[in-house]
Curated annotation (Swiss-Prot):
Species this protein is from: Homo sapiens (Human)
Compositionally skewed regions (Basic residues) per UniProt: 10-27
Domain notes: The ATG8 interaction motif (AIM) mediates interaction with proteins of the ATG8 family including GABARAP. The BTB domain is required for interaction with CUL3.
Motif mapping: ATG8 interaction motif (AIM): 668-671
Name this polypeptide is given: Kelch repeat and BTB domain-containing protein 6
Superkingdom to which the source organism belongs: Eukaryota
Length: 674
């Protein structure tokens, strides 16, 4: 018989089903995750340690090695001394790590002498080892590159290369190409070649003794440039002209290379209009002496016997065999240079994620440029765009209300993201002036506060700064450039910004009830105000005048005015069906003060109805066809089509502060092309 003490225990041990009791699974409690010693990290420790080591270096405390930097040609004991810490130099610089830890002779010496670096550059690099900061300028960048290349300081070397690439211009591009070639920096060499190709026409006319020109390149460097498909030239004459320039700069030394140089000229792309130029080319002494057979063979292959005989009255029959042999490559019909297919086109900008359309309004040719925002994460945060175009036809795109800034290089058909802007805005505008991007106007997307701050971006430095603020806030306005000044204009006021004095000046206002669009043409501001009224501002006279009204067509919902080459175009659209735009293009006749319908062959354009336009020089051979954006009126919109919700909101009027509902069109910001 069980006792009372045993009974409960036996009942507890018994399984409910009569079998063995399952084993108890022991799971860790919450406290088990927090056992053991606490581990803390001082986030300021590394910076404080580096700062303390720098203070020791400055005070020459605890230094265990002295680096003597001797000027080339000088003897030991005449150089500049740098007391340093071995551990710091070895930790920051692979060159010194090998020196001090690899069993080299210098690892046991209290003093080390260096000959292949200048003292100023070494001082900057030692400071970098202690601080992680480096100061670059036009005066020291090439010497710093050479020193950092020797000391294997990769960050400084690449920073110097990036600095040089951002400062490429007509006066230094050939020197930078030679510099990159000397150090074997492929990326910088490619960037210099691309700049030369893009500006080849201008460079072909440069010959100042104070500048390095294409004639200063080595043979290998010149051949690499002349073989580029990406040369931005309208005629092969320019390429031939540069080849002759290079040969004539040193005829005795370079003359024997004439045949090799002229092989880079694509003779198949000369036309009958080039006959006078070719006749003059054949009379040049260096051509007669070194490569007459090469050019004669090329001309005979290009023009045939009839025209060839008119160009070369007395052909050198003895050289015909060598000509045909030396010009085998010319018979392969090489492609045209990139610049030969360049066209000034009207660019349509619509929804931020849609491709941008490049259109020739006269021929109806249509191409598309991918938007850089298509694959951007959180694209719903981008509602509109602000776009401007530089004199070099680079397209700068600012997303709203985000802080993104992008640049499109037409010759490379590629987008590059630049440094983020300082402020988030919506309703802003953007303009390019003398190497700077200006962004102003609009309001804070969160608080709705109108912004007077003006952001300025330095293209060469890839940096932003705030300049003189606006005297008054701007919404629903245009920002334009005339000569060296910015003009901000809306229906009630206009201000002019002078960058040389960093100040805003008040101008004669438009004083109209409405403001639609404005652009610069012949150094005057053409403005569509109360439709169909159009007025023109002359900045020299500081006065407005009214011109003939724009054409007024019923159901037109979009008016855009742009400078297209040497013409002023008015582009209007009406929307007979959802997201289908019937586009009409008018050209302004200055003498008759009237708008002429050019009868564009564009049909229905399936594109955002609130598009805006700019004009730029692009390269159709680099672009994809855009015919898929043309449609017929009777077609039914695809079920897969999606209408993007830009989010309706009301916007306080810039002038009165009253609240009014705005259409989507008010969110699109435009800048007239230069």
């Amino acid at each position: 018989m069980q006792s009372r003490e045993d009974a409960p225990r036996s009942r507890r041990l018994a399984s409910p089903r009569g079998g063995k009791r399952p084993k108890k699974i022991h799971k860790p409690t919450v406290s088990a995750f927090f056992t053991g010693p606490e581990e803390l990290k001082d986030t300021a420790h590394s910076a404080a340690l580096l700062a303390q080591l720098k203070s020791f270096y400055d005070a020459r405390l605890l230094c265990d090695v002295t680096i003597e930097v001797v000027t080339p040609g000088s003897g030991p004991g005449t150089g500049r001394l740098f007391p340093c810490n071995r551990n710091v130099l070895a930790a920051a610089c692979p060159y010194f790590k090998s020196m001090f830890t690899g069993g080299m002779y210098e690892s046991q010496q209290a003093s080390v002498t260096m000959h292949d670096v200048d003292a100023e550059s070494f001082e900057v690099l030692v400071d970098y080892c202690y601080t992680g900061r480096v100061s670059l300028s036009e005066a020291n960048v090439e010497r710093l590159y050479a020193a950092s290349d020797m000391l294997q300081l990769e960050y400084v070397r690449e920073a110097c290369a990036s600095f040089l690439a951002r400062r490429l211009d007509l006066t230094n591009c050939t020197a930078i190409l030679k510099f990159a070639d000397a150090f074997g920096h492929r990326k910088l060499r490619s960037q210099a070649q691309s700049y030369i190709a893009q500006n080849f026409k201008q460079l072909s006319h440069m010959g100042s003794i104070r500048e390095e020109t294409l004639a200063d390149l080595t043979l290998a460097q010149l051949l690499a440039v002349l073989r580029l498909d990406s040369l931005d030239v309208e005629s092969e004459q320019t390429v031939c002209h540069v080849a002759v320039q290079w040969l004539e700069a040193a005829p005795k030394e370079r003359g024997p290379s004439a045949a090799e140089v002229f092989k880079c000229v694509r003779w198949m792309h000369f036309t009958e209009e080039d006959q006078d130029y070719l006749e003059g080319l054949l009379t040049k002494p260096i051509v007669k002496k070194y490569c007459l057979d090469v050019i004669e063979g090329a001309l005979q292959m290009r023009y045939g016997d009839l025209l060839y005989k008119s160009l070369v009255p007395v052909p050198n029959s003895s050289s015909s065999s060598s000509s045909s042999n030396s010009l085998v490559s010319a018979a392969e019909n090489p492609p045209q240079r990139l610049g030969m297919c360049a066209k000034e086109m009207v660019i349509f900008f619509g929804h931020p994620r849609d491709p941008f359309l490049c259109c020739d309004p006269y021929s109806g040719d249509l191409y598309k440029v991918p938007s850089p925002l298509t694959c951007l994460a959180h694209t719903r945060t981008v509602t509109t765009l602000a776009v401007c175009i530089s004199p070099d036809h680079d397209i700068y795109l600012a997303a709203q209300p985000r802080t993104d800034l992008w640049v499109y290089k037409p010759a490379q058909n590629s987008w590059q993201q630049l440094a983020d802007r300082l402020l988030c805005r919506e309703g802003m505008d953007v303009a390019y002036l003398n190497g700077y991007i200006y962004i102003l106007g609009g309001r804070d997307p969160i608080t709705g506060v109108k912004l007077k701050e003006v952001e300025c971006y330095n293209v060469k430095r890839n940096q932003w700064a705030l300049v003189a603020p606006l005297p008054h806030s701007f919404l629903s306005f245009d920002l334009m450039v005339i000569r060296d000044y910015l003009y901000a204009l809306n229906s009630k006021r206009m201000f002019c910004y002078d960058p040389s004095h960093n100040m805003w000046l008040k101008c004669v206002s438009l004083k109209r009830n409405d403001f639609q669009e404005a652009c610069v043409f012949n150094e005057e501001i053409y403005c569509i105000c109360d439709i169909p009224v159009m007025k023109v501002y002359n900045p020299v006279r500081a006065e407005w005048r009214q011109m003939n009204n724009i054409p007024l067509v019923s159901e037109t919902n979009n008016y855009r005015i742009i400078k297209h080459g040497q013409k002023l175009l008015l582009i209007t659209s009406r929307t007979p069906q959802w997201k289908k735009n019937r586009v009409t293009v008018y050209e302004y006749d200055i003498r008759g003060d009237q708008w002429i319908n050019i009868g564009t062959t564009l049909g229905l354009l399936q594109f955002d109805s609130n598009f805006f336009c700019l004009s730029a020089r692009v390269y159709p051979s680099c672009l994809e066809p855009g015919q898929s954006f043309l449609t017929e009126e009777e077609e039914i919109p695809s079920e897969s089509s999606t209408e993007w919700d830009l989010g309706g909101f009301s916007e306080p009027d810039s002038e009165s502060g009253s609240s009014s509902s705005l259409s989507d069109d008010d969110f699109w910001v435009r800048v007239a092309p230069q």
